[in-house]
Design a protein with these regions (language model features):
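A basic, often C-terminal nucleic-acid-binding module that engages the phosphate backbone, implemented
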Residues: 121-130, 172
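Charged substrate- and nucleic-acid-binding regions of tRNA-handling and nucleotidyl-transfer enzymes
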Residues: 67-71, 131-222
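Conserved, hydrophobic alpha-helical core segments of structured domains
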Residues: 1-125, 136, 222
Length: 222
């Protein structure tokens, strides 16, 4: 069963890294596994079909986890890592339906999970096993493992998915397109990074054309 879980020397090194105070990523992953569903009692609800739901338990659990670890005098780095794992533990299963996740989805995943992206993937595997228990569907488990393996491969082999090279910056948007400083510039630059991760943009010229078309479309819609 565990042969489905991807593993390598690089991953072993990752989970052996010390975060602070002697605690490693592997240790904090275990702590996140212990706490990831801590908010289920507070968020429990029964829907119209009679099915039990725990809407918002990941977000609520992250806040509870942070509070618990603060009271236990964990360091800021430790708290941030564990809180992030708890907050996003459902995210890997939401990246795609029946197919492997797109490059755009993988980029967004690592953007949102920050330095905890790898850790969250393994928490999702542990959660899958714990949730199904003896009712585990082997085909679904293998599918989950394949997805995690694919996302990890893209992460390690395609650095541009995690940190795309800068093709344009805020000064370009101001000088070329006459935009005013503000949040809109950040939104446009993030859209460019996503398009890069998806393989749609590979050069500065393509990025400028992409922005020009996007702004023109927005003007028409407006």
């Amino acid at each position: 069963m565990l042969d489905v879980v991807p593993w390598s020397a690089v991953l072993s090194q990752h989970f052996g890294l010390e975060v602070s105070s002697g605690s490693t990523r592997g240790l904090l992953l275990r702590l996140a596994a212990l706490l990831h569903d801590v908010a289920k009692p507070q968020t429990k609800a029964i829907d119209d079909s009679g099915r039990m739901r725990f809407l918002g338990h990941a977000k609520a659990g992250a806040a509870i986890t942070a509070n618990i670890l603060e009271r236990l005098r964990f360091s800021g780095k430790e708290i941030k890592l564990v809180e992030t794992m708890v907050r996003h533990h459902l995210r890997p299963g939401q990246m795609s339906d029946n197919e492997l996740p797109s490059h755009r989805a993988i980029y967004r995943y690592f953007r949102d999970t920050g330095g905890a992206g790898i850790d969250v993937l393994f928490l999702s595997l542990a959660d899958h096993l714990a949730t199904r228990g003896r009712h585990l569907n082997l085909a679904e488990w293998q599918k989950h493992g394949k997805m995690v393996e694919y996302v990890l491969a893209q992460h390690f082999e395609r650095e541009s998915l995690v940190i795309p090279l800068k093709l344009v910056d805020g000064h370009d948007l101001i000088n070329i397109f006459g935009m005013s400083p503000g949040p809109r510039i950040g939104e446009i630059l993030e859209a460019v990074r996503e398009a890069q991760a998806a393989g749609e943009l590979t050069s500065r010229e393509e990025a400028i054309s992409y922005i020009r078309e996007r702004l023109a479309t927005e003007e028409v819609v407006y």
